[in-house]
């Protein structure tokens, strides 16, 4: 089973950094707007091999890491751990249209699309609040 989802870019119309938190991140106040520019994320669940945890990432942008450094990979790990799924095999294909390091949330939106895709393919075990909590835990 597989699903393809858009991962829209966003721009900050207003951003105020309020202070550093104990976890090293900053509290912010922002107003943002999605734009028409999107990455395209395809998530595919494959038949798992007992005892195997496999996340395979491919990307149209050669400079993007396709391993645990990628937020899409971290999102998949967070999803499977959050659902107590310990045997899994999935493929994630990232068609990059959002420029890297442009401040348009390309990595974050890709991770969010992976969470939404895995949740849909798994029969929606997590509600929106749980998905948001996983996303917040992944980082930026």
Model-found features: residue ranges?
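Extracytoplasmic/periplasmic copper-protein system
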Residues: 132
